[in-house]
Amino acid sequence: MKFIHLTDTHLIEGGGNLYGSNPNQRLRQAVAHFMMHQPDAEALVITGDLTHYGEADAYKQLREILSVVNKPVYLIPGNHDRRDVIKDYFPSIECDENGFIQYTKDFGDYLAIFLDTNEPGVSWGVFCEQRSTWLRKQLADSTKPVLLFMHHPFFPIGIHSVDAISLRETAPFLDAIKGFESRIQQIFFGHIHRPITGSYRKMPFFTLKGTNHQVALDLHAEADAGIPGRLEAPQYAVVCLSLEQILIHIEDYLDESPRFSLKG
């Protein structure tokens, strides 16, 4: 199975600019690019911060932009999102029994679990006992290898201002996955606006640049210095799944540099 991973689209009302770039246009360009170059992808996943201010019109535009995608689209909220407005504009989105936007899908041989770390009014992530109980049940009810999708990382990534707004009170999350770590084959994040890959307690993780603006790589500034922004080029990921391999390619979809044959 092949799917596309996008994150942090940050659409705004009226389709204007944000930090000197146009998030709505950037998303349209991403969609057009992967529809042309990856037509055999079977799904699109967007890991949160779908909009920047949570405006109804921004979700309306998101729905319109994604309407041309001829494959299933799976969304989760980020800290910039409003869960209630997502449900208004995407009424078929699945939720757990407590109203959190959490659900599972079969991705080929894998169980894909989509998690909700949104907490209204704050930038950091929250994963409460209700969400933890739901996650643990999904893990217990399946024997498949697992892909986790969530907006906030649950460990530090070294950019201190971003770490300050990652998942807080990680115990409920870690309790939920305890004993299932060996089945978690890949964790996909948003929130960071940087291409990062590695592993945490032997669980591989991956995140990438957003489609509008990025976070600069500064591993020295203190947390209270503010999040350092940059207008680096946006990306999407092409993820290829088999039982033997999880392969992730990163596409700089606005790159227009010439292609040429490498000889000798």
Language model regions located:
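Active-site environment of divalent metal-dependent phosphoester hydrolases
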Residues: 12-15, 52-57, 79-86, 120-123, ...
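Binuclear metal-dependent phosphoesterase catalytic core
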Residues: 21-24, 176, 199-264
